[in-house]
Amino acid sequence: DSGTYEELLPITIPAGVKLHGAGIRTTNVKPQAGLSADGVTPNNETTMFYVNNACTVTGFSFSGMTGFTPSGSEPENLELATIKGVFFAFDPNGAITTKSPYIKDCSCFSEGGVGAFMDRQVHNTGNKSMVFHAFTNLNSNGVGFWVRYGAKSEIVSCFTYYCHVGYSTTTGGKIRALNGNNSYGTYGVVSDGYDPNENTVNGNVEGEMIEYADDGVHQAYFANGETITGGTSNAT
C-alpha cells in the first residue's frame, strides 16, 4: 500500500518472495530511529534488505541510509572505504541457486548510503548475483553499485546521481551494464584488482614489437608523418 514505512532493520526477504509497492512516488521505506536489530549498530548504518534466491522487489523508493566514508589515501578504492548504510546485500544465511534477486522500478535517496553491495565472500555456493532494472540511485557522497570478489550483476537502465562512486568492481567482481549513466558525482565507473581465485588463460602474442630506448633518440621529438622503423626487427 501507499505510505511511508519506518522499519527496524535489517529486513530479510525470503527466497521466492516478491515485495510489490504501490509505486516509487507513493511507497517509501526508511529506517526507524535508534539502533538496528542487533542492538548495537545505528539503524540507518546497517543493511536495509538482505535478498535471497528468486526474490523480487518492485515499486518502492528507499531513503535514510548513511555512513559510507571513502579512504583518504585512495578515495576511489572501495576496498579501503568504510561501508555502512547499504540498501541491498546478499543474505549471509542464503544462496542464489536458481534465479538472481531482481530489483526493478525502484529508487533510493540518501546522504552517504550504498545502493547495492554484492560480495561473493558472503556465499560459499550459488551464483552470487543480483539483477537490477530501472533502480535509480541518488546517494550523495555514497555509492551506487559495488560488486566484489567475483560476484556478478546485470545493471540495466540504472542511473546514479551525486555518488562518490557510481559503479565499482573490485577483486574480480563483474558488472554487465546497459543504458545507464553516472552523473554529478566524483567517480563514475571504477574497477580495481582481480579475483585471486581466477584460473588464468595463458597465451603468446605473435608479432614484432618496437621498444623505446631513451638513450638512442637523436631528436627531441618525432616529426609529423615520420615513419618509425625498428633497428633490429624492421617493424614499422
Predicted segment positions?
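All-beta strand scaffolds that present successive hydrophobic residues in beta-strands
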Residues: 18-21, 56-59, 96-105, 124-134, ...
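Right-handed parallel beta-helix
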Residues: 56-150
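Autoprocessing Asn-cyclization modules and mimics
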Residues: 49, 71, 75, 79-80, ...
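Contiguous, function-dense segments enriched for cysteine-driven chemistry
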Residues: 185
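Extracellular beta-strand-rich solenoid/capping regions of secreted or surface-exposed proteins
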Residues: 4-20, 28-59, 63-96
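Surface-exposed loop/edge segments in extracytoplasmic proteins
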Residues: 25-30, 234-236
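A generic "binding-loop/recognition-motif" signal
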Residues: 25, 112, 151, 163, ...
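Short, T/G/N/S-enriched strand-turn elements that build extracellular solenoid repeat scaffolds
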Residues: 5-14, 18-19, 47-51, 87-96, ...
